[in-house]
Amino acid sequence: MRRLLILPVLLMTFSFFSCSNGTSGEEQKTADTTAAVTPAPAEEKPAFTPFKLDYIQHRVKNFNTWEAGYLAHDSIRKAYGLTPFLLGRDMKDSNLVYVIDKMDDLAKAQQFAALPDLQKVMMKAGVISKPAFSYAEVIRSDDSPVETNDRVGVAHHVKDFNVWLKAFDAEGSATRMANGLADRMIARSLIDSNMVYITFAVTDMAKAKARITSPELKKIMTDAGVDSPPTLRWYHLVK
């Protein structure tokens, strides 16, 4: 008889805990569901670190022949701290080439430019003009994707870099974008820090050319202390 009384008690106890566990499972499921839809924190973009560039401009007989020679010379460039960064061809003269390499050290890059063998290699690759070298440090860079390989490089001298930069920022990237120019890069010459190089992606060619030659922009540049005629390089990125 006693065993018969104990059995219902055990059954009731089992049922109670079963119900309790079921409720906890629902609560856990709800909690898990809530946790699953919580958005993950956005990844922070790494802080920008300035870097140095070696700009080379020259004309070639045949681009493909020259490029093969350029690539074959890669190990020598690396020995002098130079690594390929960008390669462009002029819009009007596709055999006018703009080579931009990242560089570790200015002195080494200048030694590379003065190598007697370099002149021989360039001639063999079909370079038919005296190469022009420039060295700069990039202080701003935007490498976010853009749907164009068209670029314009603007080079000019300024009286005071900080005054110029303040005016550039006051003009604003939105204004430039509305005129077909997307900010990509600002660099300062390592030979003369008041020599400035600005690179834009060209999103609307007609608007960009109109803006760059406009009296409004000319006034902005004059007021900002630009004291040399700007040099413009319109080109297509190849790499």
Residue ranges and their predicted role:
Residues M1-R2:
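N-terminal secretory signal peptides that target proteins for export/translocation
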Residues L5-T13:
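Sec-dependent N-terminal signal peptides
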Residues S15-S18:
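C-terminal motif of bacterial Sec signal peptides marking the signal peptidase cleavage site
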Residues S20-K239:
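Short S/T/G/P-rich N-terminal loop/turn motif that feeds into the first structured element of a domain
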